[in-house]
Amino acid sequence: MSTHTIGGWNIEKGGFTDYATELPPQNPKQDRIARVIQSLGADSIVISDAQGWGNPSVRAACLPEYSFTSFTPLGDDWLTSRKPGQCNLGVAFATNSPVAAQEIIDLGNRQGISTTLNLGAQGLRIAGVYLNHYSEDMRIDQARALLSYLDKDDTPTVIIGDLNTQQALHETGITEHCRSLIVKLAAAAFSAIRHPYGEHLSGLEQRKVLPILSAAGFSNTATDNRPTALFPVAPLFRVDHALVRGTSRRNYQVHPTGGASDHRPITIDIDL
């Protein structure tokens, strides 16, 4: 039996200094990003918050060891109407394995990338997604659109990316319950002064998306609740996820970010 290692990483602002419609030709963090990605040892990887990665030279500099890369913009109405400077945002995919098919996943007001690899008896499909930042209701709609797409066939599938949602509280222990209470109090305080963190934190504590994916047969690969996202400087939330259906997995890991992002990369091994 062989294995295929899949990585997922939200690279803050794509590695650039800020969100902008006009970006410099060279990614200022490209060397640091490339070192972190190389250290993961992933056969395939999904990159979210990939601002500017529609430029093939940017992808090549950050992903030098991969023979195939692709990019899709998010097409997010919420993103482009409220923050037009973020229109370069998207999801990138890279692999060293033979690609059988690749399609854009229409999530209603965002897009993902579905890539089927020529691996195993039935192939292996990797759905790279980056769900909405603030609204759990929008994330729920996007998750349902994702399932509608994936349920067309029974290809073994991995969903991986920054889902901007957390594990359901009933699946966690007392420590997470206490932390959740603190976050809810912080959300109320931020909302009282009309700070955008209020909406963001309130949405994170709704925790509805993963149960929807679980009900459709997708298993969360995480073996613990180690956080992946820094908010704003401490690792507090596990919002980057890898879920599988129709295949076995092992060796879920959270890796150091190397100072290249406000998210830690994750990897899992898929048995073929």
Where are the predicted features?
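Metal-dependent catalytic neighborhoods of phosphoester/phosphodiester hydrolases
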Residues: 48-65, 78-88, 170-176, 235
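Short beta-strand and adjacent tight-turn residues that come in two discontinuous sequence segments
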Residues: 47, 71, 244
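Short small/polar-residue motifs
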Residues: 64-67, 98
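Active-site regions of metal-assisted phosphoester/phosphodiester hydrolases
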Residues: 1-39, 44, 84-272
